[in-house]
Amino acid sequence: MAKGKDVRVTIFLECTSCVRNDIKKEFAGISRYITQKNRHNTPSRLELRKFCPYCYKHTIHGEIKK
């Protein structure tokens, strides 16, 4: 039986370097990935190194609010 809320939630990961450089308008957009995380194992914000097609390199992608 499930207890309360779902343990696994869907989150969005956004490129942190594109967000910072968006003010300068150097890149065409902001890279976002959709994934899931377990709330019990990782209660804090998730940060992963993923490939950003706008920066053309691997950067840190941080969890954002929906």
Swiss-Prot record:
Pfam families: Ribosomal_L33. Keywords: Chloroplast, Plastid, Ribonucleoprotein, Ribosomal protein. HAMAP family: Ribosomal_bL33. Belongs to the bacterial ribosomal protein bL33 family. One of its GO terms (molecular function) is structural constituent of ribosome. NCBIfam families: PRK00504.1 (NF001764), PRK00595.1 (NF001860), rpmG_bact (TIGR01023). PANTHER family: 50S RIBOSOMAL PROTEIN L33, CHLOROPLASTIC (PTHR43168), LARGE RIBOSOMAL SUBUNIT PROTEIN BL33C (PTHR43168:SF2). InterPro entries: Ribosomal_bL33 (IPR001705), Ribosomal_bL33_CS (IPR018264), Ribosomal_bL33_sf (IPR038584), Ribosomal_zn-bd (IPR011332). The lineage of its organism: Eukaryota, Viridiplantae, Streptophyta, Embryophyta, Tracheophyta. The keyword Glycoprotein does not apply. This is Large ribosomal subunit protein bL33c. One of its GO terms (biological process) is translation. One of its GO terms (cellular component) is chloroplast. It is found in: Plastid, Chloroplast.
